[in-house]
Amino acid sequence: MKKILDLGFGRETLRDLCNSGQISSRLLYGMAEISHRGNHIVIECSMSSHSGLIGLLKNNMMSLKKADIIFMSYIYESSLVLICLLKTLGLYKQKKIVGVCHTTVNQGENLLDRIIKKLVFNSFDKVLFHSYVNMEESLSLKTIKRSQAEFLYWGDDLSYVDKVFPIRSHGNFFVSTGRENRDYSLLINAFIDMPLKLEIYTNRFNYDNNYDYLDNYRSKYNNIDIYMVDRSNETTLHLLERVAACRCVLVPLIQSKVNYCLGLTSIVEAMALGKPIISSVNPYSPVDIEKEEIGFVVRNVVEWKSALQYISENPDEAKKMGIRARSLAEKKFNIEKCSQQIESVFSSL
């Protein structure tokens, strides 16, 4: 039985919320399921949020805690420098490192960055990717080796979704709940002269994104409602309620920011709740929406309008898309499959 150090921000809080049934276990990336199965011991370890040298030192010291495997659902390179340096020097060689990479592993912007990246990623035993494209780009850049790389299926906690939302309706409105790099101007323009209802839920600020401009649209159009929300468990649950009641989930993406699996959370939520999806083009997404016949991929306002009209005028077909979406979630994109895949990696090391 191996001891797994689950290293990341807020891990203990997420574990407690998950164990009490307040949130989906998807944010724990399979650690809850692995812990429940009892084949490995999972120790959640919350990284320090202190900035500067103090936080850096604290987080690097955490990586030295007694464990067989370090797991990071988000790879924070600066927090692994010490353990990776020790592994490179022949110390701590028995400690394995596994992480989930959400972007392409680039070569670094300067000499110091390149040195750190090479040190850290050479020390990883397995790097799991959400996107085949990001994985292949990383391999082409030779920042990781083929033996290190593996595609990871990820999705929602279907048992949680079914328990909280046992009945899903098919309302007369479309919903978009994304926070990261969303092109809401384009989406709103598609709805302005259409007799369709749109609900947008997002944060006013999200990292580099500033959605203050949405104030110009609030109360301007009778068919468009815009809500600025905070980050809380209550808000997350409310947004899921709106997704469960909507006709279709919309994922409008800023195309200049599409270099990773942007929008994946919105997509897997929609699939878990059996909803059709209309999304901007994203070649990095692991879900082929049109091939799986669970919705539409669009490129401009004209295509947005066409897809919206089809969903609106063909409710029976829209429901079939939603059924296929849920089926795909059950087969591939769910947290149980994710946990099994990660546990298989742990067992192989």
Kindly label every feature range from the protein language model.
Residues L139, E150-G171, S185:
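Acidic anion/phosphate-binding donor-loop and adjacent secondary structure
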Residues P166-R182, L187-Y201:
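Conserved donor-binding/catalytic core segment of Leloir-type glycosyltransferases
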Residues T202, Y211-V243:
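Nucleotide-activated donor-binding/catalytic signature segment of Leloir-type glycosyltransferases, i.e.
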Residues N233-L237, E241, V249-V268, S279-V287:
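Nucleotide-sugar-dependent
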Residues R247, G274-P276:
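A short alpha->beta transition loop at the rim of the catalytic pocket in nucleotide-sugar-dependent
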Residues K291-V302, Y310-D316:
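Conserved acidic donor-binding segment of nucleotide-sugar-dependent glycosyltransferases
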